[in-house]
Design a protein with these regions (language model features):
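Accessory RNA-recognition modules of RNA-modification enzymes
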Residues: 1-230
Length: 230
């Protein structure tokens, strides 16, 4: 795809012989989705890949001597269970090829939405599915359209979800292409049934931009923040 002086960028076209380190991704759309590009790599090799990526950047961009990194840099710390760990998720909202309302992630290097199967991304917390299901059902019932970036029409652009692993607190923010979210009280009534719900807001973003969040936040219910502990 692109060649630099000391390295290049490439795209996988065909697998002739699978590596011994290749595994079957847990998510069926991992290959198309831009959310977890190395899920087909076994976890130990993922940690090694991330370690080397940081190391190479420190050498190439930071000018740190290799000998010093060999002496002080420790291996990447892993997890017992490398799923359900992300405390933040941003889902673009749109329609699939059949016209059905959907939430997902952008395919790599595009703005094509790859729907998350059953609205349940294996990297995010399980509560995300219930939240997305509630929002999509609300939009369907109330005839609220998703944002269309081609003609700048529609209302709901993204859904941002944050989760506090230590506190169990949940924040939901709908990014909208408008001043208000119609019938928001109905959505609030549904979302507040989810244990841990603490903050429900709207972010106003009416610009023709790739930037997700707007500059103005409307509080629909609860408080403007959640808390967690490190």
């Amino acid at each position: 795809m692109k060649a630099k002086k000391h390295y290049g960028y490439a795209r996988l076209m065909k697998i002739l012989q699978p590596s011994k380190d290749r595994v079957e991704p847990v998510c069926p759309v991992a290959r198309q989705c831009g959310g977890c590009q190395i899920q087909a790599l076994n976890y130990e090799k993922q940690l090694e890949f991330k370690h080397n990526k940081v190391r190479n950047n420190l050498i190439r961009l930071g000018g740190i001597p290799e000998e010093l990194l060999d002496e002080i840099m420790e291996p990447a710390a892993g997890m017992k269970e490398p799923f359900r760990y992300r405390n933040k998720a941003q889902f673009p909202i749109g329609r699939d090829s059949d016209g059905k309302l959907t939430a997902g992630f952008y395919a790599g290097r595009t703005h094509q939405i790859i729907p998350v199967p059953e609205c349940d991304c294996v990297l995010g917390v399980k509560e995300n599915k219930e939240i997305l299901d509630a929002i999509l059902e609300f939009m369907q019932v109330e005839h609220i359209e998703p944002y269309n970036e081609e003609n700048h029409s529609g209302l709901v652009r993204h859904v941002l979800i944050r989760y506090g692993f230590r506190t169990g607190e949940i924040m939901v923010c709908l990014v909208i292409n408008g001043k208000t979210l119609p019938h928001s009280e109905k959505l609030v009534k549904r979302l507040t049934k989810i244990p841990g719900m603490t903050s429900i807001t709207c972010s106003i973003n009416r610009e023709k931009t790739n930037v997700i969040m707007g500059t103005k936040i409307q509080l629909l219910w609860g408080q403007m923040y959640i808390t967690d502990y490190i």
